[in-house]
C-alpha cells in the first residue's frame, strides 16, 4: 500500500470502546482514543481515520449535536482541532476518512485525542454502524506527526466485528430447471432488515410443494447459530412447474420459493445461476476472498462464481491466492468457481472489462500497476495492457472470455471490441441498470450476449443488497443454459451467449426461433472469420445463424418469480411489441408512478427523486414502494390525499403504487426536482404517460394497473419478418410487478 512506512512503531496507538460484536445497521456511540507516539504531532500535523470505500458507516457530521452521526474530537492538552469528513481524499481502499487536523498548538508524546463517533452527550441518537457484515471492520488510523502530509498507518488499528440482526425476510430457493429424476437441493434462509443472512432464527416451519417432491419433509427447523437450512437429494419424477410454500406452525405463509421447472430426462440444457463479478477486501471489497466464495455458495446458494478484483491492486501473491481458491472451491456438479480479474482502465482507453479464464495459472495483464509498489511485483509491468486494444491483443489465443461492464468507471465498447473474446455486456449490477451499454453494442453491430452480476463490494455475492450508500440497486444474476454444472460447460455457455440476465430474481425464461428451413449456425461471431459449425432450424437465445428464410416463428415462455407486468420484444434497437397479461378492461383504481434513469454514464450518475404527489378529487386508500432498497428512503409522509417520499435511481427504476378509494375520479399531480407533472386519473391506461426529465434516459411515467395481479406465466408465439439484409436481433425484456427485470441474450439471424 503506497503510504509511508517510516517507523510505524513510533507513530502512537489507538483504542476503541466499545469493541467486539456489533449488530449491522444498529445505532452506537464509539469512542476512539489516539495517544501520540514518540514524535507527538506538530502544529498542522494530522490524523486520518479511514474506512473502506463501500462502507455506509455514518455519515459523520459536526454541526448538529442532536442529529445522527454527530462526531466530536478533543485534545487532552486543549489544542485546537479541525474536523473534516472526506470521500476519496484518502488512498483506496480507505476512501472515506475522518480528517483531524491540529491547527493551533501541538501534541507532545503521550498527549491524546478523543474522538466520539455518534456523540450522544447532547442528544444525538448515535451513529449508524455499517449495514452489512464484516469480520474485521477497521477504524484505520493514519498519522502525520511531522506535518508532511505523508501518512503512516499505525501497526494496529481498532476493529469491531459486524454481525447480522434478527431475521425478518424469509427466502426459499430452488433451482430453476432440472431434469426429471435428477437430485437437487432446497435452501431456506432469513435475512435481517438490511439483507444480511441471519443466524438468530430458531423456528420450525412447514414445507408444502405445489406438486410432489420426493424427499421433501413436511417440516424443517432453522437453528440459532446457523445461517438457514439446506435439504439435499430431492427429486421430481414428472415434468412440470412447481414451487414450495414455507409457513410457520400456525399456517401463516412466510415465503414462496422461486419456480422450478422439471423437464424431460433427455433435455440437453438446464439452468444454473451465477454471479461472476465482485471483489473482496484484498482489493476494494469486504471480507476475504475465501469468505466471498463461501458466501456465494453457502448463503446466496448460487451455482457459479467469479472474482473480479481491480487489476491495479492485485499483487502476484494475491493472484496466486485467488487461483488457489478458485481451484479449491470449484467442485464439478456442486459449484463452479472461475479465476479472473477486472481489467480496470480509464474509460478514455476502453474502460472496465471482466476477464474470465477457463483454467488457473494464466498470466494477468493489468491496465496498470497503480497501487502495486513492491519491486518483485513490478517485475511483470511489461505485460500490462494500457488500453483495451492492447488487452485484446495480449489475450489472443488465451482460453478466456471478456465482458464489458459499468462500475464506477464504465466500459466504452466503441473504443475497442474483439468479436471472439468479448462475448457479453453487463446490463445490470448493484451500480444500476445500463441498457445503453447493450444499445452501444447493437449500434456497432456487435453480436454479444447480455449478462448481469452484483459487481458487489459488500461481501454478499449472489444476494447483494446496496446498503445505505451510493449503490442504487440490488445486484444482478446471470442464468446460464448448460448441459451440466462444471467449468467447461459454463464456459461453453458464455462463449455461445446462452444466458439471460435478471436484476436479482430467479425466474424462468425461454426464447426459441423456428425457421422453415435449415440455417447455418455459428459458434463464434462470423466477424471472427470462423465458418459455420452445423445447421439447424431451431435456435435459442445467444445463437447466431445465417438463413435464406424471410421470416421466423419466435416463441417466448416466462415463469416469473412474481406476477408479470409487461414483456417488450425487440429487434436490436427497435421495439417490435409490448405484451401485457392484462388489458384496459382489467385496470383498477391503482396508479403507478415510475421514476427512472441517471444523470449521465459516469460515477456521479445518481439521480435524486425526492418529491411529493397529491390526489385531487379522490383519496389514497393504500400505497407501497417498488425497488426501494435503502431503508433511509421510501415513503416518509402520507395523508388521504398527499404522499412524500425519498428515492434515488442509478439507471434503474423505482415506483410508487397508489390504490385509490374512488375509482378513476379526479387527478394526480407530482413534483420532483428533475420533473413535475399532472394527469387526469381517468385518462391513464396501460400505456404509460411519460414526463421526460433530461439526463440519461430519465423520466417519470404514470399508468394504471389491475388492482390485483396474479399471472406469473406468459407464453406467446409471433411470426416476425426478417430484415432483407443484415442482422435481425431478437431479444426480450420482461418486467415483473415487484420491479425485477429480465433480459434474454439476442438471437442473431443474418441475411446476406
Feature locations, PLM:
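Short, solvent-exposed loop/linker segments at the N-terminal edge
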Residues: 20-27, 40, 176-182, 541-549
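C-terminal functional module detector
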Residues: 173-177, 193, 210, 216-267, ...
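Domain-core and long-helix interface of multi-subunit machines
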Residues: 316-324, 341-343, 348-350, 354-469, ...
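Aromatic/hydrophobic beta-strand junction motif of beta-rich domains
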Residues: 32-38, 117, 186-190, 553-560
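Short S/T/G/P-enriched beta-strand
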Residues: 1-17, 153-194, 198, 258-270
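Ser/Thr/Pro/Gly-rich, low-complexity intrinsically disordered stalk/linker tracts of secreted
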Residues: 1-169
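Short, solvent-exposed loop/turn segments enriched in Ser/Thr/Gly
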Residues: 26-30, 43-45, 180-187, 239-241
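A metal-dependent hydrolase metal-coordination microenvironment
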Residues: 240, 255, 261-397, 493, ...
Amino acid at each position: 500500500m503506497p503510504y509511508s512506512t517510516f517507523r510505524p512503531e513510533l507513530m502512537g496507538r489507538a483504542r476503541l470502546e466499545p469493541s467486539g460484536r456489533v449488530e449491522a445497521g444498529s445505532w452506537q456511540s464509539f469512542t476512539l482514543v489516539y495517544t501520540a507516539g514518540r514524535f507527538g504531532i506538530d502544529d498542522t500535523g494530522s490524523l486520518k481515520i479511514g474506512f473502506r470505500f463501500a462502507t455506509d458507516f455514518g455519515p459523520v457530521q459536526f454541526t448538529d449535536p442532536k442529529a445522527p452521526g454527530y462526531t466530536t474530537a478533543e485534545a487532552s492538552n486543549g489544542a485546537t482541532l479541525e474536523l473534516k469528513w472526506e470521500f476519496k481524499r484518502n488512498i483506496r481502499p480507505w476512501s472515506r476518512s475522518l480528517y483531524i487536523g491540529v491547527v493551533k498548538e501541538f501534541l507532545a508524546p503521550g498527549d491524546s485525542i478523543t474522538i466520539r463517533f455518534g456523540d450522544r452527550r447532547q442528544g444525538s441518537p448515535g451513529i449508524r454502524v455499517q449495514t452489512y457484515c464484516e469480520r474485521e471492520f477497521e477504524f484505520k488510523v493514519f498519522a502525520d506527526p511531522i506535518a508532511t502530509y505523508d501518512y503512516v498507518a499505525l501497526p494496529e488499528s481498532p476493529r469491531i466485528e459486524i454481525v447480522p440482526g434478527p431475521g425478518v425476510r424469509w427466502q426459499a430457493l430452488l433451482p430453476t430447471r432440472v431434469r426429471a429424476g435428477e437430485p437437487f437441493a432446497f435452501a431456506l434462509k432469513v435475512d435481517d432488515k438490511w439483507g444480511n443472512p441471519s443466524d438468530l432464527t430458531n423456528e420450525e416451519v412447514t414445507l408444502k410443494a405445489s406438486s410432489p417432491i420426493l424427499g421433501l419433509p413436511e417440516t424443517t427447523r432453522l437453528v440459532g447459530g446457523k445461517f438457514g437450512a439446506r435439504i439435499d437429494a430431492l427429486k421430481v419424477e414428472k415434468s412440470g412447474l412447481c414451487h414450495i410454500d414455507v409457513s410457520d406452525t400456525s399456517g401463516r405463509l412466510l415465503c414462496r420459493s422461486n419456480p422450478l421447472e422439471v423437464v424431460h430426462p433427455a433435455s440437453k440444457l438446464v439452468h444454473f445461476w451465477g454471479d461472476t463479478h465482485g471483489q473482496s477486501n484484498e482489493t476494494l471489497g469486504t471480507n476475504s476472498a475465501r469468505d466471498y466464495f463461501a458466501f456465494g455458495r453457502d448463503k446466496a446458494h448460487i451455482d457459479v462464481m467469479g472474482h473480479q478484483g481491480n487489476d491495479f491492486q492485485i499483487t502476484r501473491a494475491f493472484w496466486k491466492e485467488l487461483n488457489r481458491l478458485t481451484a479449491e472451491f470449484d467442485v464439478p456438479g456442486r459449484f463452479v468457481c472461475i479465476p479472473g480479474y477486472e481489467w480496470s482502465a480509464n474509460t478514455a482507453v476502453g474502460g472496465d472489462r471482466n476477464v474470465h479464464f477457463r483454467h488457473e495459472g494464466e498470466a494477468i495483464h493489468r491496465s496498470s500497476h497503480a497501487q502495486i509498489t513492491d519491486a518483485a511485483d513490478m517485475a511483470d509491468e511489461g505485460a500490462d495492457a494500457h488500453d483495451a486494444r492492447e488487452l485484446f491483443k495480449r489475450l489472443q489465443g488465451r482460453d478466456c472470455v471478456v465482458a464489458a461492464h459499468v462500475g464506477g468507471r464504465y466500459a466504452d465498447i466503441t473504443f475497442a471490441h474483439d468479436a471472439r473474446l468479448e462475448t457479453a455486456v453487463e446490463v445490470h449490477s448493484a451500480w444500476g441498470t445500463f441498457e445503453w451499454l447493450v444499445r452501444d453494442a447493437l449500434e456497432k453491430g456487435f453480436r454479444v450476449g447480455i449478462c448481469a452480476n452484483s459487481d458487489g463490494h459488500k461481501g454478499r455475492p449472489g444476494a447483494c443488497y446496496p446498503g445505505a450508500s451510493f449503490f442504487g440497486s440490488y445486484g444482478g444474476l446471470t442464468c446460464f443454459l448448460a448441459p451440466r454444472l462444471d467449468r467447461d460447460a459454463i464456459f461453453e455457455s458464455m462463449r455461445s451467449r446462452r444466458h439471460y440476465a435478471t436484476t436479482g430474481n430467479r425466474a424462468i425464461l425461454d426464447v426459441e426461433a423456428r425457421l422453415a428451413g435449415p440455417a447455418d449456425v455459428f459458434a463464434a461471431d462470423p466477424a471472427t472469420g470462423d465458418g459455420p459449425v452445423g445447421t439447424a432450424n431451431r435456435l435459442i437465445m445467444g445463437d447466431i445463424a445465417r438463413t435464406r428464410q424471410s421470416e421466423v416463428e419466435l416463441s417466448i415462455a416466462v415463469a416469473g418469480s412474481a406476477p408479470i407486468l409487461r414483456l417488450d420484444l425487440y429487434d436490436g434497437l427497435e421495439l417490435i411489441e409490448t405484451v401485457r397479461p392484462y388489458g384496459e378492461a382489467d385496470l383498477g383504481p391503482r396508479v403507478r408512478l415510475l421514476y427512472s434513469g441517471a444523470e449521465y454514464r459516469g460515477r456521479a450518475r445518481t439521480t435524486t427523486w425526492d418529491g411529493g404527489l397529491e390526489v385531487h378529487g379522490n383519496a389514497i386508500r393504500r400505497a407501497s414502494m417498488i425497488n426501494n432498497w435503502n431503508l433511509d428512503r421510501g415513503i416518509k409522509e402520507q395523508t388521504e390525499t398527499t404522499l412524500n417520499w425519498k428515492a434515488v435511481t442509478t439507471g434503474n427504476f423505482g415506483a410508487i403504487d397508489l390504490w385509490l378509494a374512488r375509482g378513476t375520479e379526479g387527478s394526480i399531480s407530482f413534483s420532483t426536482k428533475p420533473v413535475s407533472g399532472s394527469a387526469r386519473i381517468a385518462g391513464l391506461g396501460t400505456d404509460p404517460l411519460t414526463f421526460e426529465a433530461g439526463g440519461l434516459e430519465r423520466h417519470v411515467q404514470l399508468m394504471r394497473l389491475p388492482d390485483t395481479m396474479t399471472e406469473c406465466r406468459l407464453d406467446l408465439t409471433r411470426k416476425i419478418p426478417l430484415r432483407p439484409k443484415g442482422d435481425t436481433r431478437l431479444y426480450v425484456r420482461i418486467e415483473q410487478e415487484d420491479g425485477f427485470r429480465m433480459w434474454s441474450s439476442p438471437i442473431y439471424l443474418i441475411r446476406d
